[in-house]
Amino acid sequence: MARVKKKVLLIEPNYANKFPPIGLMKIATYYRNRGELYGDGWEVVFYKGDLKRFVIERITDKLIEKLNDADGTNRDWHFHKDILFEYVRTRRTELLDSLPVTIPAVSDGEKPVKNIALLDLVNEAKDKYWKKTWEQEPEWDRVGVTTLFTFYWDITIETIEFAKRLVKDPKDLMVGGVLASIQPRELSEVTGLHIHKKGQAGGIHIGILRAGDLDKGDEQKIDELELD
């Protein structure tokens, strides 16, 4: 049986900058390499933007998988992703009229009926977002947040606090970068995160990442890795 991949989410706060997050790109390479080097491959996802939209996107993607499995036709629900996303985001019931959830009449005189099973899946996804039950089922084994300059303090803190809701265990939330290296103790006081200890991925990382910083015994020199 194939081993289930762990998942790591790498986040750049929605900074107004155009430079690529080099640190996160090297960390992405690190995690992708672990599959070949140590046999524990990771699924790596990078995100920059509105994290609420990210949550809705993930809920919608899982909804599409369920709809494709439950629908008895050859329909591909990916073609309806935009409408599904908007319904989960807004709860506007008129959007349901644009979805193919009607079972055609099989004989003259019969009226088409709604496919309740499909509608239930759609509404479960909507409720998962609005009732915040997604917070009870975090998807990510590790989450990393990069930081820039101190004048981005507010958005950095907001991102870290949101990231706590995405990771399965808060001790596996990694924060690094410029601000984390300049003001680690101030960041620790505000967020409650500990200063990083070698061999434990989570915490506030100061300076560059070295071999063994994220996983004990891993000999990859992270700062020297190629960009993903």
Spans of features found by a protein language model:
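A short, structured N-terminal alpha-helical element that caps or precedes a catalytic domain
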Residues: M1-V190
